[in-house]
């Protein structure tokens, strides 16, 4: 008991208070009782009802905080002598909703069954039917990334996170393709894969920082915005400006960490090392300004970075012609030199920032702009020997270039697109193909070709390989599905390749185009040989592919646990070929003969079988392990011969010295 102003209060009665969510409403008795009303916290409300604290403030001042991004910086007073960009007073942040889509919005909400119209309310709600949802948290899944590595990454970890994300994305795309198309539903397996990786800790560089990001290199390419988020290069999944709040002289203030120049605004500049960047906001859609931009959030952060001389990471967004999508190239650090306000094409004020690339960095965007000029022929490629060494055999030209010495080209060979098999190398008996009309539909188990692939279509809708398998079975030319997408390796080269002279490894192969992980590059063309008959001549043949070699194992497929699948369903990634296959491209071959060995390759080989001239043969197809930037040499692991044994404790010791220069170089191959 406690005395208070002459009265006694029994405090034990106060301690028995229950949370509001445990109380049940008490309805008045009688037929004239008013109906029970349920209305949104911001209204509208029926007559006689009003909101209660904390929802009593105006709706305009309410917004959902973005838990994945830094909160809006506090308002700063306008200085007495502002620069041109400060000519407008910044409005209150609360009146402008966040442009960044929270990652939690990609998860499906837990809803009730059926439809309901609330009696006595002016608001009608349609409650969708309950459906199973995937939880991003899985107590049984271990990401394998500790807290320290999650905050600060390295090159190996960055590549691992990107590979795991894309493997999961390809699996989700495969599952979506197998479903019936629903009108108005846009399939975004990248968002689903990204939110899953975020929720389960498959990410790195979560500690936001300006400047260099550990493990991310200049020239790295990304095909999805979520990839940049997972490796800490650029956190927002939609906004073009990323920033963090730091302590200023008198108060906290935002500084920009990175920007994405998506090309939606007038950002083009003749000099590839200079970027005129348009601020964010004021746009109803991506093509047209609808109102004046405001000095807040990212725009304010860029202005503060200008005053602090703080470098900003720049990611260039480019159009990918082959898939009608965007590709992003990390172009390094830029310094903000000046800012101003000008009228845009739509007549509204926009903030402009001039950024200049820091000197001493390797080229990235500049190389891409040079490649676009090479494709037009003006100017011509420096060191060009032949514009098309295939003489039109390939649908896309393959250039021959030497910028190293005076060598005019490799030794003569016949260019071909098909493997030459003798009668003794028909590896399998022909089988009946499918009877699908026009194309094989993913998920159709009546298709003979899909059944041979284990019930799953081996490629996504845009021709990307989903998983490595012991063998992939493609539809043959004799199948009636003329427009089938299960003929990826039979369609020839689809990227602009270049054979070039290397500094210390002879001729090599690279691409003018960025190559997406899982993309088909080419098959290995040559003459099939009997290993027992060519054992002696193989030592003098630098253009031999041997499927019997021993290769370093590596993990490329998706993780069933990350996809909420049974781990026992994980398929083998080891190739299985019925008979030893050796292909010599010394006299007859294609561009594959110029791919050099690397102990850390960016390309892998996959056995593919399809019928040709009423006989089934195995072909060696090459696919990209990861995203490959333009002008990066394409390499694969040659492996070592099985009888080589061990040397210096290394079971993979080959006959030839390796010059790949990789940090994981084993010193030899072949």
Swiss-Prot record:
Residues 495-639 form the SET domain. Zn(2+) 1 binds at residues 434, 436, 440, 447. Residues 654-670 form the Post-SET domain. GO terms for biological process: epigenetic regulation of gene expression; methylation. Zn(2+) 4 binds at residues 599, 658, 660, 665. S-adenosyl-L-methionine binds at residues 505-507, 541, 543, 593, 596-597. It comes from the Eukaryota. Pfam families: Pre-SET, SAD_SRA, SET. Belongs to the class V-like SAM-binding methyltransferase superfamily. Histone-lysine methyltransferase family. Suvar3-9 subfamily. This is Histone-lysine N-methyltransferase, H3 lysine-9 specific SUVH1. It comes from Arabidopsis thaliana. The gene is SUVH1.
């Amino acid at each position: 008991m406690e005395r208070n102003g002459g009265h006694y209060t029994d405090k034990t009665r106060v301690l028995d208070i229950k949370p509001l969510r445990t109380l049940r409403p008490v309805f008045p008795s009688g037929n004239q009782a008013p109906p029970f009303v349920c209305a949104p916290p911001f209204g509208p409300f029926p007559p006689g009802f009003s909101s209660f604290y904390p929802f009593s403030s105006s709706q305009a001042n309410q917004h959902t905080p973005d838990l994945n991004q830094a909160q809006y910086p506090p308002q700063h007073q306008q200085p007495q002598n502002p620069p041109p960009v400060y000519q407008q007073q910044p409005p209150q942040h609360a009146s402008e909703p966040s442009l960044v889509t929270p990652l939690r919005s990609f998860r499906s909400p837990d809803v009730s069954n059926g439809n309901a119209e609330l009696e006595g309310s002016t608001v009608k709600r349609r409650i969708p039917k309950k459906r199973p949802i995937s939880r991003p948290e899985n107590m049984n899944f271990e990401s394998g990334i500790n807290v320290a590595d999650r905050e600060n990454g390295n090159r190996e970890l960055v590549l691992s996170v990107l590979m795991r994300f894309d493997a999961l994305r390809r699996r989700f795309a495969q599952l979506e393709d197998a479903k019936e198309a629903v009108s108005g539903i846009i399939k975004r397996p990248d968002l689903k894969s990204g939110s899953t990786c975020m929720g389960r800790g498959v990410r790195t560089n979560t500690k936001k920082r300006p400047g260099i990001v550990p493990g991310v290199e200049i020239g790295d390419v990304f095909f999805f915005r979520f990839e940049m988020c997972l490796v800490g290069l650029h956190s927002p999944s939609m906004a073009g400006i990323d920033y963090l709040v730091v302590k200023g002289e008198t108060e906290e203030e935002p500084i920009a960490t990175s920007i994405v120049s998506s090309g939606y605004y007038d950002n083009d500049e003749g000099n590839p090392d200079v970027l005129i960047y348009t601020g964010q906001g004021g746009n109803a859609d991506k093509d047209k300004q609808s109102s004046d931009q405001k000095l807040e959030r990212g725009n304010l952060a860029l202005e503060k970075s200008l005053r602090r001389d703080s470098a900003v990471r720049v990611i260039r967004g480019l159009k990918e012609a082959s898939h009608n999508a965007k590709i992003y190239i990390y172009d390094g650090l830029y310094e903000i030199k000046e800012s101003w306000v000008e009228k845009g094409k739509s007549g509204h004020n926009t903030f402009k920032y001039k950024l200049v690339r820091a000197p001493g960095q390797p080229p990235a965007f500049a190389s891409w702009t040079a490649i676009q000029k090479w494709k037009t022929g003006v100017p011509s490629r420096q060191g060009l020997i032949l514009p098309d060494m295939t003489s039109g055999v390939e649908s896309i030209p393959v250039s021959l270039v030497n910028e190293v010495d005076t060598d005019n080209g490799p030794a003569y060979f016949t260019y071909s697109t098909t493997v030459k098999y003798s009668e003794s190398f028909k590896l399998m008996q022909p089988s009946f193909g499918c009877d699908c009309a026009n194309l094989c539909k993913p998920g159709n188990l009546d298709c003979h070709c899909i059944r041979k692939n284990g019930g799953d279509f081996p490629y996504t809708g845009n021709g990307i390989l989903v998983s490595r398998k012991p063998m992939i079975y493609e539809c043959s030319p004799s199948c009636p599905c003329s427009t089938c997408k299960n003929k990826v390796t039979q369609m020839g080269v689809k990227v602009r390749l270049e054979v070039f002279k290397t500094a210390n490894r002879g001729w090599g192969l690279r691409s003018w185009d960025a190559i997406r992980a899982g993309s088909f590059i080419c098959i290995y063309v040559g003459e099939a040989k009997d290993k027992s008959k060519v054992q002696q001549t193989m030592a003098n043949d630098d253009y031999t592919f041997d499927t019997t070699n021993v290769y370093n194992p590596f993990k490329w497929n998706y993780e069933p646990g990350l996809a909420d699948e049974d781990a026992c369903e994980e398929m083998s990634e080891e190739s299985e070929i019925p008979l030893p296959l050796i292909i010599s491209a010394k006299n007859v071959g294609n561009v594959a003969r110029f791919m050099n060995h690397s102990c850390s390759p960016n390309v892998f080989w996959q056995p593919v079988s399809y019928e040709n001239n009423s006989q089934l043969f195995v072909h060696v197809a090459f696919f990209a392990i990861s995203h490959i930037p333009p002008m990066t040499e394409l390499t694969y692991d040659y492996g070592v011969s099985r009888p080589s044994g061990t040397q210096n404790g290394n079971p993979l010791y080959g006959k030839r010295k390796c010059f790949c220069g990789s940090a994981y170089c084993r010193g030899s191959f072949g």
